[in-house]
Design a protein with these regions (language model features):
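Short acidic, low-complexity intrinsically disordered linear motifs used
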Residues: 1-10
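Compact, glycine-rich, soluble single-domain proteins
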Residues: 11-154
Length: 154
């Protein structure tokens, strides 16, 4: 992820946490499938994301609850597994989708700046409040499309 803003105290989307039996995960239906998603709802969790993972098991992933609805840019920093990303507005409408490809890791001769500059950015292109990362190929497998609604109410 490229940038990030602080959380406001009145962010109603964080109520999702109170509805889950496990405060670190959320069960969500995406298309016809049920997923167990890790929640990234704090600055540290958003920055960490799925970095360092070698794979993403079927029907799992991560739901990012961003501090505000705006254009979001994600990257595959230290991510070793391809994945799909769904960008959703505050109403749960898919505004953009990407298949994000794993990048080669930073090598010992590469500066941090050069490493970051070579990473591809995946943009929501329109304001998004939520980002869902799921296993690669699930967008196609589930026949998801821009404009489709994902019910985020629990």
């Amino acid at each position: 992820m490229k940038s990030f803003l602080s959380f406001g105290e009145e962010d109603k989307s964080l109520d999702l946490l109170e509805e889950s039996t496990d405060p670190d995960t959320l069960n969500l239906t995406i298309g016809p499938s049920k997923y167990t998603l890790e929640l990234a709802d704090t600055p540290d969790k958003i920055i960490q994301g799925l970095s360092g993972r070698q794979s993403i098991p079927r029907k799992t992933g991560m739901l990012f609850v961003m501090p505000e609805e705006r254009i979001q840019d994600f990257w595959m920093r230290e991510c070793f597994a391809d994945m799909d990303a769904l960008f959703l507005d505050s109403n749960g409408i898919i505004v953009n989708m990407h298949r994000m490809l794993a990048e080669s890791p930073r090598n010992q001769f590469e500066s941090e700046s050069n490493y970051q500059n070579r990473l591809r950015l995946y943009s929501s292109d329109k304001p998004a409040k939520y980002v869902i990362e799921i296993p690669s190929g699930d967008i196609t497998r589930l026949s998801l499309s821009i404009g489709e609604n994902i019910d985020l109410s629990i």
